[in-house]
Amino acid sequence: GAILGEDGFGFDFEKDGTPIRIPHIGSIEIGNNVEIGCNTVIARGTLNNTKIEDNVKIDDQVFIAHNCKIGKSSLVIAFAEISGSVIVGQNCWIGPNSSIIQKVKIGNNVTIGLGSVIVEDIQDNKKIMGLEGLDLRSLVKLKKRIEYGK
């Protein structure tokens, strides 16, 4: 089954370097017509709530960290990892095995290809893939330049 509302992985450090857990007192909000797959984990917020909006579909074995917001009608596919405080816009497709670093903002109508690593914000209507989340159109142009010298 899925695990909904677990404490996020938030730590600070004592002066001697000992890690201490930061309490998570937020909750999660799940909209209407949401599907959440097996072995998925959605962490509750640290102070504010983690939010999954209406019509979101989350596949099996997805991890969504504390304070995230997943916009309406977005799809999150197997093994995707969304780090803390990420905001995903509406109508997005987050591909399998993709990872999004904390505090990134993903615009509306964004497609993130499988295995992508996203380390910065993405504007609306982009198709992104690759190790550093390259815009798909830019990647195709670069490939053509390399192959054909154009």
Predicted regions mapped to residue ranges:
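Long, leucine- and charge-enriched amphipathic alpha-helices
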Residues: 140-150
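Structural signal for interior beta-strand "rungs" in well-ordered beta-sheet cores
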Residues: 2-135
